[in-house]
Curated annotation (Swiss-Prot):
Transmembrane segments: 32-52, 78-98
Listed name of the protein: Protein Asterix
Family: Belongs to the Asterix family.
UniProt feature coiled coil, ranges: none
Membrane topology term: Multi-pass membrane protein
One Pfam family of this chain: ASTER
Keyword field contains Aminoacyl-tRNA synthetase: no
Predominant localisation class: membrane
Listed GO biological process terms: protein insertion into ER membrane
Organismal lineage: Eukaryota, Amoebozoa, Evosea, Eumycetozoa, Dictyostelia
Amino acid sequence: MSDPRKESLIVERFEMRASTEPKEGELELYSLFSIIFGFLGIMLKYKICLWVSAVCCVAYLSNLKSKDSSVRTILSPVSLSLMGLVMAYFGPNSNLFV
């Protein structure tokens, strides 16, 4: 018996992989949002802004590659978000933070 499939209708299988790398400006946006929300949280005394800053900072650090890292780019968002959270919860006027 011969093969009933037609040779012209056979499609070869190929594997599609989704790109998991962050886009071009995504890392800079996480860093920028972390700094902006950190300043807003410290100046306006909003704890929610400080927590958003901390989440953006963690997202920035988790997607950071070794070739993009320098001390200044890592230290700015981390120090600002941590300083704001420490001031909000352990500062002398911590009961004023709403």
